[in-house]
Amino acid sequence: VHSVVDYVSAAEYQVYPWGINDPTEGNRTTLHLPWLKTLSTDWHIDGKGWYSTTRGNNAIAQENPTGGPEYENNYRPKSPLFIFKYPYSKAMTPPSSYRDASITQLFYTTNVYHDVLYILGFNEKAGNFQINNWNKGGVGGDYAILNSQDGSGVNNANFATPPDGQPGRMRMYTWNASIPERDGCFEAGIVIHEYTHGVSNRLTGGPENSRCLAALESGGMGEGWSDFFATAIRLKPGDTRATDYTMGEWASNRPNGIRKYRYSTSLTTNPHMYVDADGLTSVHAIGNIWASMLYELLWNLIDKHGKGDVTKIRPVLKNGVPTDGRHLAMKIVLDGMALQPCLPNFVQARDAILDADKNLTQGSNKCEIWKAFAKRGLGVGAVFNLSKRTGS
């Protein structure tokens, strides 16, 4: 046992580190013990054993070229010394030639996100994804199943979220809009987007009910929350409210990304308003509107509280409140999910965020929150009607 502990204490991963969204933003780096150490465990144990592969309490990552339901016996890299360093370059082809690097990247990104969310409140009681909940509440037995290069599709990704106690399943695909084709596991925003579906489905309506985002508008907000967290996490030190971001631009090989409008605080660049949801039947289109509002909220809180050191993984909290505007926005949006009703609409989700801030900070950010939503038509007088919304 002591020798295994010694090896884990030397664990290394060659990956695009946290904050680098895709290969255009930086280089792969060898990271030593990247997990956040104050949490209950490292990434390779679950209370029952040590795993010298991409498996642990929070996730199990493997390839799935057939696209089938099996995963436990699928291929995953193994390293008795816990050294997960494998070759990858953007020119390598086919994707199967760099499967070890892909699986390792997926395992790394997901585990870091699990740790960040844990600090922000998505823990065992909230219904997070862990095999062992260490007697801290919730239902265990539900790590996230992570399929790299899943053969059930292309040019997309998805996350299936059953109730607490049953594993979530992420399917990451390859994208064929470029030569050579690209692996979505190397675009962190896509991985974070998909995992956030698990978060929003577990929190809304309670972890025992994972069908509370099944309506059109609530499902659209599910897409929006996923875009929002992916975008907030990729902020750079020099970013300002004039900085715009896209979604999925690297994997899709589209400079403008896969949404109608970039995320921007400019109404010229992104003119989306609440009433634009009238007549929409696509959850992704509705989500683009919701995430645009949350992007306004993000920058209002950053302008008030600062961005913090975005090169650091760990959120800094004082008395349970993030000290920077970026993580504060993430925290109240996360808390709002747990407060809103099952099958919420925009108005109800907005009110839940206001309630979350009231609970967390005694409402000290009320004005910044209202200004963000009112700028895009979800102000005090906004009224929900599926076919005829009232903006304000």
From Swiss-Prot:
UniProt-annotated binding residues for Zn(2+): H193, H197
GO molecular function: metalloendopeptidase activity; zinc ion binding
Catalytic residue positions: E194
Stored PROSITE patterns: ZINC_PROTEASE
Cofactors (names): Zn(2+)
Record-listed E.C. numbers: 3.4.24.-
GO cellular component: extracellular region
Cell compartment(s), UniProt: Secreted
Family: Belongs to the peptidase M36 family.
Protein name according to UniProt: Extracellular metalloproteinase 4
Protein species of origin: Trichophyton violaceum
Classification lineage: Eukaryota, Fungi, Dikarya, Ascomycota, Pezizomycotina
